[in-house]
UniProtKB/Swiss-Prot annotation:
Protein's cellular compartments: Cytoplasm
Protein purpose: Major role in the synthesis of nucleoside triphosphates other than ATP. The ATP gamma phosphate is transferred to the NDP beta phosphate via a ping-pong mechanism, using a phosphorylated active-site intermediate.
Enzyme Commission number(s): 2.7.4.6
Cofactor(s) named in the record: Mg(2+)
Binding-site residues, ATP: K11, F59, R87, T93, R104, N114
Protein's recorded name: Nucleoside diphosphate kinase
Family: Belongs to the NDK family.
């Protein structure tokens, strides 16, 4: 099993609920290390650029509006099979379908306000990390 890096966003709904620490604890207790982190308010341009692959889909405008509705926490997580592990911790995109004990089952409201985002592949992780972090901002622990 390889050590990987993955990208995570704690979305505005979870930040507003003040559960950043609870979510971060889940990452760490599962063996993931946080090697970069920032709290930021996304601009419309940043959100549109990050989610550009969805620009032709009907939900794009609502997604951008939601992601700019409040601050987010962007993070780089590192660990054995970090991408798959993070996706397992998050649970299904729709919190109603998420397994009990997953982040989305415990903290998300809806398929739109679903608490967290995580990279779905190594290519996506590399792109998403580079979108928010310079190489000098990502450490090794």
């Amino acid at each position: 099993m390889a050590v990987q890096r993955t990208f995570s966003i704690i979305k505005p709904d979870a930040v507003a609920k003040n559960v950043i620490g609870k979510i971060t604890t889940r990452f760490e207790e599962a063996g993931l290390k946080i090697v970069a982190s920032k709290i930021k308010q996304l601009s419309k341009a940043e959100a549109e650029g990050f989610y550009a692959e969805h620009s032709a889909r009907g939900f794009f405008g609502d997604l951008v509006a939601f992601m700019t509705s409040g601050p987010v926490v962007v993070q780089v997580l590192e660990g054995e099979n970090a991408i798959a592990l993070n996706r397992e911790l998050m649970g299904a995109t729709n919190p109603k379908e998420a397994a009990a004990g997953t982040i989305r089952a415990d903290f998300a409201e809806s398929i739109d306000a679903n608490a967290v985002h995580g990279s779905d592949s190594e290519a996506a992780a590399a792109r998403e990390i580079a979108y928010f972090f310079a190489a000098t901002e990502v450490t090794t622990r």
